[in-house]
């Protein structure tokens, strides 16, 4: 005992969560300002919180619920999926966040040794979900250099040439960490490529409402497609841990397999969180879009802070809550830059190496209100200018 040789090779081979490393870094600092974690600055709707407050003493809140989720929440989600996402043939399972939804799907769809496809820069938690479940052949495809959109031509070649065919392709739309989005024609083409190849497509729609400058989010539906959604960012419910899976109602046995996984991880999402979600949905998507509008100013503030890197080196800001910035040549060790920015300038961001892209930074503009965002951006700009002109001065 006490030897690493006694621990699971799967977990030993899984990346350390970057946010756990960032939290440790922040604990070393005095008054750091975080542009790191993907959070929003608002809380759930006040009316919804007031209703939940009245339920705290109800014994049902402390009980287990159906594995798939409360019936009233699932019905509300089906209505939302039909009306807003145009998903008319889907069923849903409620999960303890979108990350847990993704893990459920990986365990349901993949066997150890299967190959899967992601696109660079990828969402680090999804990559880790594959690692920890024994999916060791993770094929990482390129994003287009000018847009970071998934390269569909590369995907078509890869799926046709790989033997056996990869089991799953996954995309995040809009992108985390890229802050870009997948236009509808491209998303439909990716879906068709996956269908023709006989592989699953998982689309993470966590940031579905976070679209800017008139751009529109869209979903695709099919028997080979599974969509993942989240309440965390939309309704400011990060700590309430609630997400859901939308899958084709025509898939025989799929729900049964999901229940097996669900019953052995959370059993069910927290009942009080599900009740809050029911009440939050009553506020409608307009409640979300009003708050997302406030992020446009934040995005522009952070973009301005990143200008010294050159506009061609800053991508994203089309959707989600992220900008994706390329560091100057000679600074490929992005985690070293992150630590330096934190200790020298008191601002914290995420290294691109966590998403398979050394030499980049992910900068979140969702977690602070405008006044604080300006202060954090000022620290970031000062740090970047010093990095460019003098290097990492101690």
Curated annotation (Swiss-Prot):
GO CC annotation: cytoplasm; cytosol; mitochondrion
Subunit structure: Homodimer.
UniProt GO molecular function: L-tryptophan:2-oxoglutarate aminotransferase activity; L-tyrosine-2-oxoglutarate transaminase activity; methionine-oxo-acid transaminase activity; pyridoxal phosphate binding; transaminase activity
Disruption phenotype: Suppressor of sav3 mutant plants leading to rescued hypocotyl elongation in response to shade and restored auxin biosynthetic pathway. In continuous white light, elongated hypocotyls and petioles, with increased leaf hyponasty, decreased leaf area, and accelerated leaf senescence as well as early flowering. Increases levels of auxin (IAA), indole-3-pyruvic acid (3-IPA) and the ethylene precursor 1-aminocyclopropane-1-carboxylate (ACC). Indole-dependent auxin (IAA) overproduction phenotypes including leaf epinasty and adventitious rooting.
One Pfam entry name: Aminotran_1_2
Protein name: Aromatic aminotransferase ISS1
Catalytic activity reported: a 2-oxocarboxylate + L-methionine = 4-methylsulfanyl-2-oxobutanoate + an L-alpha-amino acid; L-tryptophan + 2-oxoglutarate = indole-3-pyruvate + L-glutamate; L-tyrosine + 2-oxoglutarate = 3-(4-hydroxyphenyl)pyruvate + L-glutamate
Gene this protein is translated from: ISS1
Compartmental location: Cytoplasm
Species the sequence originates in: Arabidopsis thaliana
Tissue: Expressed in roots, cotyledons and flowers.
